[in-house]
Amino acid sequence: MNSEDYLNRLLPHRLDALAIAVLMLKFRMQWEEPKSMQIYVDHRLQFEGMTTMFTNPALEVGVLHARALLEFMGLKVVSGILVQAVPNSRRSDDATIEKLTGPTGPLSLVTPEEAGAINPSDPEGAKQALAQTIVAGHKGLAHSSATYFSKPVQAESILLALQVTQQLIERYVYLPLGRQRPPVPIEARPRE
């Protein structure tokens, strides 16, 4: 793994996808139904349609990137429970947190307890939301599973998981490396 490339290119790209998904999910949760939408590029109308043409793919991409980041940090799901990956069970070509080195040595895998502690008011809820989001990315998006579609994840759980994932990266990657997270490249304005 090329650590500098991962930290300077791929990690910010994944975090941008999460930030955009969080923003879109917050908007979508405010709307009772899809709204009409126009997208302008360089002050010219380029796309017209319903909000779902943008929000749905943005959310799906965010869930997939969250799954990848959680796996990068050493978290996975076994029998519906968030658990820590066994370090030597990971493939040699996987991008993993323990391949990054800070001033005090290699970074450590994140434990489920550390992941839950990001949300001190409900650590178990945070762990459950993360587990559900990993499963959603795997069984609902990367693969098609009939059992998943009978019980999809609630929007509130996905929102919590996306936000917790961002905070985990900040706390367990950027902070130990003495780096700042790059700024989010999108702004939104409230509707009038």
Locations of regions flagged by a protein language model:
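Long, hydrophobic, amphipathic alpha-helical segments used as structural scaffolds
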Residues: 73-80, 141-152, 173-180
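A structural signal for well-ordered alpha-helices, especially hydrophobic packing surfaces
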Residues: 22, 66, 70-73, 137-141, ...
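Charged, amphipathic alpha-helical oligomerization/scaffolding segments
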Residues: 61, 68, 129-136, 160-171
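Short, hydrophobic, well-ordered secondary-structure elements
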Residues: 55-80
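Histidine-centered, metal-coordinating catalytic motifs and their short helical/loop contexts
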Residues: 101-151
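Short acidic alpha-helical/loop segments enriched in Asp/Glu that coordinate divalent cations
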Residues: 29-42, 46, 75-102
